[in-house]
UniProtKB/Swiss-Prot annotation:
Keywords: Membrane, Transmembrane, Transmembrane helix. The gene is DFP1. This is DUP240 protein DFP1. It comes from the Eukaryota. Changing S106L: In strain: CLIB 382, CLIB 556 and CLIB 630. Its main location: membrane. It comes from Saccharomyces cerevisiae (Baker's yeast). It is a multi-pass membrane protein.
Length: 240
């Protein structure tokens, strides 16, 4: 079982302040001050208010919602004058409601852009975040900025918090963990990618992306091991 990130409560209280004291999201050599990075969870009073903010800015959802409201009002008007709820009215309401639900579902789907996913993997490889590490806040900020600047999201608030970004990363590398093979003589493991795994998994993925997947998965495996070692130091979990 993978541990969850601990919530960071040291973010700045002023959402209008500059989110960074120094550094640039596009320059990994100039580190960001994670304590001063402002994420949506620091700006919004609740997740519900954040979600409402995002949905309102999705024009296609709002257009369909307004059309649905107009349909409801028109149907109620027809019922008021005719006193009859006809099958056509029911179908009209169901179609309008289905369109709204479909648009909200598409809004909540994970972004599948390969460049975005590769950048996230490279951010993890660059920052080598630990479990519950402050590096995840920096990574989340960088990814939010990238999605906004690349036009893949309408606001710079795609990930509500670092926990959400971390969960997305875990889903991305799920099934991509390198096999850990144990040297029984030295009780030390070493990580390798079996030939059959490399041949069968992600055969349609570019070699660079494939390397990023396995490298990021290796870093995650190390982070998980270090986390549990810190929680149970007397168990003697072997180093990877």
């Amino acid at each position: 079982m993978q541990p969850y990130l601990k919530k960071n409560t040291h973010a700045t209280d002023d959402p209008k302040a500059s989110p960074l004291k120094e550094g640039s999201p596009d320059n990994p050599e100039s580190p960001l001050i994670s304590a001063d990075i402002v994420l949506p969870e620091d700006e919004f009073a609740s997740y519900q208010s954040y979600l409402l903010y995002e949905i309102v800015r999705a024009k296609y959802i709002m257009i369909n919602f307004l059309l649905f409201v107009v349909t409801i009002l028109a149907t109620l008007t027809d019922i008021w004058f005719s006193g009859v709820l006809s099958p056509a009215m029911v179908i009209r309401i169901c179609l309008g409601g289905s369109m709204v639900v479909l648009q909200i579902w598409s809004f909540s789907r994970p972004i599948s852009n390969e460049t975005f996913r590769t950048k996230l993997l490279l951010e993890v490889i660059t920052h080598r975040p630990s479990i519950a590490g402050k590096e995840w806040k920096t990574i989340t900020y960088n990814m939010n900025q990238y999605l906004f600047k690349a036009g893949l999201w309408k606001t710079p608030y795609h990930f509500f918090c670092e926990h959400q970004c971390y969960e997305f990363f875990k889903d991305l590398i799920k099934g991509k963990y390198p096999d850990v093979q144990w040297d029984t003589a030295n009780t030390q493991p070493f990580i390798s990618v079996p030939e059959n795994q490399a041949a069968t998994q992600n055969s349609d993925v570019e070699p660079t992306v494939k390397w990023c997947l396995f490298k990021a998965a290796e870093i995650q495996a190390h982070a998980v091991r270090e986390y549990w070692q810190s929680q149970y130091p007397d168990v003697g979990i072997p180093a990877i």
